[in-house]
A protein has these predicted regions:
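Extreme N-terminal segment that seeds HTH/winged-HTH DNA-binding domains in transcriptional regulators
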Residues: 1-36
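Phosphate-bearing ligand-interacting subdomains
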Residues: 23, 28-31, 134-225, 231
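HTH-adjacent hinge/linker in prokaryotic transcriptional regulators
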Residues: 37, 41, 46-92
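N-terminal Rossmann-fold NAD(P) dinucleotide-binding loop
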Residues: 101
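NAD(P)-binding Rossmann-fold cofactor-contacting core
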Residues: 111-133
Length: 232
């Protein structure tokens, strides 16, 4: 089942959207340890932002925190999941089952709650036909089923062709791990993940003694280097 768009009561800023999954991960960690409450100061210390920023971000999800008592961990996880759309079902296809693609689909952290891996594609005859993560890798010449998200894990030289194929399959959200900017029609969202760029940014800060050299989870996840996380 593919997800269908629905309206949100309040539009969240891009920095807030970037921080919310980190808050959710922190809350899930508390839950795993048997804890039921977490406050904005504790979240902020682990995330590397101020308590004020945390409260402002979470205020956009409605009123559910208790002054002096913090947030119920279960409610916090559910509110963030709803805000980010994790309470719906998403079908995901991955194109490029080389080292990176294989590692991603085999990772327990790759798919968010509600996401379902439905198809894998590659052009390598040595890869096509193999079963990975419970799915048989199909040749890229096969039709791509309609899905919510397409993930590109190919070399840069193949990225545009793959993006075109995903768009033709009526996929309007693309996560691109290939080191290549792709052109897509209006209405299609592309998010780029380029480890070499992240490493260059990190090396700059290391060499100049600036930027995200410490702090919390937002820094260690590499998010702070590419997003203005301390802003609103």
């Amino acid at each position: 089942m593919m997800a269908t768009p629905r309206l949100r009561s309040k539009k969240l800023s891009e920095p807030t959207i970037a921080r919310l999954p980190v808050y959710q991960r922190i809350a899930e960690g508390r839950l795993q340890r048997g804890e039921t409450k977490v406050d904005s100061r504790q979240i902020g210390e682990l995330a590397g932002v101020t308590a004020t920023t945390v409260r402002r971000d979470l205020a956009g999800l409605g009123s559910f925190g208790t002054r002096g008592a913090g947030y119920d961990v279960n409610v916090l996880i559910e509110r963030i999941a709803e805000a980010l759309g994790h309470d719906r079902l998403y079908d995901v296809v991955v194109v490029g089952i080389g080292n990176l693609g294989r590692a991603l689909v085999n990772s327990s952290n790759f798919l968010i709650r509600g996401a379902r891996l439905v198809a894998l594609y590659d052009v390598d005859p040595d890869v096509v036909g193999h079963e990975i993560a419970g799915l048989t890798v199909q040749p890229l010449s096969d039709p791509i089923p309609p899905a919510t998200v397409g993930v590109i894990c190919t070399p840069g030289s193949a990225a545009q062709e793959v993006a075109d194929r995903l768009v033709e399959a009526n996929i309007h959200a693309i996560l691109n791990f290939a080191p290549q900017v792709v052109t897509v029609p209006l209405g299609t969202a592309v998010h780029y993940v380029d480890f070499s760029i992240e490493l260059q940014i990190l090396m700059y800060h290391l060499n100049n003694g600036t930027g995200p050299l410490g702090g919390g989870l937002l820094h260690s996840l590499g998010i702070a280097s590419t997003n203005p996380l301390r802003g609103s």
